C-alpha cells in the first residue's frame, strides 16, 4: 500500500510540475501581446511566488538536515543561494516597478553574483558522497564542455559594439565565467543520472542549473545588444529554472525525510 501511495504521489507531483511549467509558459507568452507597462508588471510579479517557493523549501530542508554531514552543509549552501537570488529578484522588481529605473546594472547584480559560489559549493558537497562513481574522464569532459561554452560567450561580450560602458562589460563578462563554473558539476550530475547513479529528482536541480546558464547567456547577449526587455521569452527560462529548483528540493524533502543523519545510507534510494 505504501509503495502504491508513493507512486501516486510521484505521478501527481510530476503532473503538477508539468502544469506549473506549462502555465508559466502560457503566462509569459500572453504578456508579450500586452502593452509594455502591463507586461513588465506581470513578468516582475512572477518573480515573487516562484523564487519564493524555492526559498521557502530550501529553508525547510536546510533546517531539517541542519549542519550535520556533507548533505546538511550542501542544503545550507543552497538556502544561502535561494536567499541571495530571491533578494536579487525583489531588488530588480522594486527598482523597475517602484523607482522606474533600469535595474541593470544595479545592486541586484551583487546578489545574483553572490549566489553562484553558493551554488557551486552546494553541487560539490552534494556530489561528494558519489565521488566513486565520478571518473576523471567525466570531470574532464564536463570541464571541456563548460569552457567551450564560456569562450564564445566571453568573446562576444568584448567584441560587441553596444553602448555598454567598461563597468557594464566587466559585470556582464563575470556571468559567463560563473556560469561555466556551476555548469561543470551540473553536467556531471546529469551524466550520473543516465548511468543510473542518481535519481530524476537530483537531475531536476542539475537541469535547473543548465537552464539558468542558457538563460544567462541569452540575457547577456540581448542586454549587450540593447534588445532585452522585461517579459522577453528568455525570462521564461529563468522562471522554469526556479520551478525545477523548487520541485527538486521538494522531492528531496520527501525522499530523505527518514534519512536525516545519513541520507546516503542506502545509495539505491537515489536511483
Can you name each region flagged by the protein language model?
Residues 1-271:
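Polytopic alpha-helical membrane-helix bundles and their juxtamembrane interface segments
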